[in-house]
């Protein structure tokens, strides 16, 4: 159903895949409602993903500009599937520090797009030092959100206050830590059950740079999506950390969806769990 008052949502990810993997469903839900969604990968992730682009994994490295071109092509395809706009920045991944100039450029995007909601990484998300860009980008975006409303900011664009910031929870490497995939608790769930196939299509657009096979896409969707959906009582969900106080006039009764289930490790069935740990 179209939204009578369209939202403007900006997603800032360290790498293009971060935005698609974490929020493709949310993006699809909102573009279908008539909302305006802007994806902003802060880097191409060319250094991090370069080995994946080698003819055989680990067989060598390709020129960065070649990798960037490949990733940009893939990201454009994914955003087209999702109905989102793309603003690709060109900061260096793996060594992104969140300098004044980098924060200023992010600030200008916020002031220009004027989003109601900003989505980015949790500032503590280093994935056990494997992904330092996550935390650094999250911190830089949080600073830019504040800076966007500072009248002394070095920008020709008018100031703007972002009212809502959602964070992707800080996480373990889920391939290694399947039982506890996030180390910061999610408290905001988006039901993406109706757009799960759109998310799958968007993820498959990244198959060149991240080796996203059909099997990997299915694992991400039936693993984490179902895992968090079970926690929320829906078939599939994407999760966030809501950073602002949530105020209500009074407490309300809440119905739990029919898919409420035991929180199993991603990809596990109840039978597997019982066989491993017993009843």
Predicted regions and their residues:
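Metal-dependent de-N-acetylase/amidase catalytic core
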Residues: 1-10, 85, 97-279
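Active-site rim/loop-helix segments in enzyme catalytic domains that contact anionic ligands
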Residues: 1-113, 273-277
């Amino acid at each position: 159903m179209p939204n009578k008052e369209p939202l403007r949502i900006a997603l800032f990810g360290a790498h293009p895949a971060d935005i698609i993997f974490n929020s493709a469903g949310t993006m699809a839900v909102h573009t279908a409602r008539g909302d305006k969604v802007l994806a902003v990968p802060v880097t191409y992730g060319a250094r991090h993903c370069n080995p994946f682009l080698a003819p055989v994994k680990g067989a060598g490295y390709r020129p960065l500009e070649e990798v960037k071109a490949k990733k940009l092509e893939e990201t454009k395809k994914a955003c087209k599937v999702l109905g989102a706009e793309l603003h690709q920045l060109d900061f260096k991944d793996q060594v992104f520090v969140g300098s004044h100039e980098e924060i200023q450029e992010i600030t200008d995007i916020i002031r220009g797009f004027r989003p109601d909601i900003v989505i980015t990484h949790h500032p503590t998300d280093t994935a056990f030092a494997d992904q330092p860009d996550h935390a650094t980008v999250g911190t830089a975006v949080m600073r830019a959100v504040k800076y966007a409303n500072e009248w002394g900011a070095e920008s020709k664009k008018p100031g703007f206050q972002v009212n809502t910031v959602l964070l992707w929870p800080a996480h373990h490497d889920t391939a290694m830590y399947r039982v506890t995939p996030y180390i910061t608790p999610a408290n905001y769930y988006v039901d993406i059950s109706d757009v799960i196939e759109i998310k799958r299509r968007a993820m498959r657009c990244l198959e060149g740079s991240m080796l996203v096979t059909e099997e990997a896409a299915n694992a991400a969707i039936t693993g984490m999506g179902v895992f968090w959906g079970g926690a929320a009582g829906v078939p599939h969900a994407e999760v966030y950390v809501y950073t602002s106080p949530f105020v209500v006039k009074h407490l309300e009764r809440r119905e739990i969806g029919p898919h409420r289930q035991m929180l199993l490790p991603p990809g596990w069935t109840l039978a597997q769990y019982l066989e491993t740990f017993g009843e």
